Regions:
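Classical Sec-dependent N-terminal signal peptides that target proteins to the secretory pathway
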Residues: 1-25
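A generic "folded-domain core" signal
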Residues: 23-189
Length: 189
């Protein structure tokens, strides 16, 4: 009976830890990270949690914004590497675009791949205003990988769509931009 009680207690504790973590993570879901050269504002996906929407700025030029996203695939054959530096068709909230594959990282002994895409490089203030207007009109930011010339998306990706809620984007981006500018100012001093 004592073992059963310990077993139940441990499972209950684990359950509470998981629930508490999820509640904390779902509060706004944004993460600000940096390294020596860049600062990143990221948000995990709603469909595949590990997929990220990324806004990045170089400390040398905070007025230039890089908009990136990642998709994880466990379906891609070995020839997935052929798409590095190529543009792949996507839809972004039902509007047709393309995104450049800028990095493919094999993981799990080459049984899966992280694929990083670039949507582009933009003037920070203009792009953030544009995106803030977009957020007011749409509840979600949804990216769907699409078929293209010599590219069948289902051959390479098991899950072809993800979405992100961009609640509190403006506030979090303002904080990220401020930190970028502060570090740039400290570098110049």
């Amino acid at each position: 009976m004592k073992r059963f009680f310990i077993f139940i207690s441990l499972h209950l504790l684990l359950f509470l830890i998981v629930i508490a973590y999820q509640a904390q993570a779902s509060e706004d879901g944004w993460t600000i990270n940096d390294d020596k050269d860049y600062i990143y504002l990221t948000k995990n996906g709603d469909v595949i949690y590990g997929d990220k929407l990324i806004f990045s700025m170089d400390y040398n030029d905070c007025d230039k914004l890089y908009h990136l996203f990642t998709f994880l695939t466990t379906k891609a054959p070995d020839d997935v590497q052929q798409f590095a530096n190529k543009r792949i068709p996507i839809t972004l909230n039902d509007m047709e675009f393309s995104a450049e594959v800028i990095h493919i990282q094999p993981i799990l002994n080459n049984r899966a791949y992280w694929v990083m895409f670039a949507l582009g490089e933009y003037e920070t203030e203009k792009y953030v205003k544009l995106l803030s207007g977009f957020i007011k009109e749409h509840k979600r930011y949804e990216i769907v990988l699409a078929d293209g010339l010599n590219f069948e998306v289902e051959k390479y990706f098991d899950i072809t769509r993800n979405s992100w809620r961009l609640d509190k984007f403006s506030e979090k981006f303002a904080e990220t931009y401020k930190r970028c500018k502060e570090k740039t100012t400290h570098k110049d001093s």
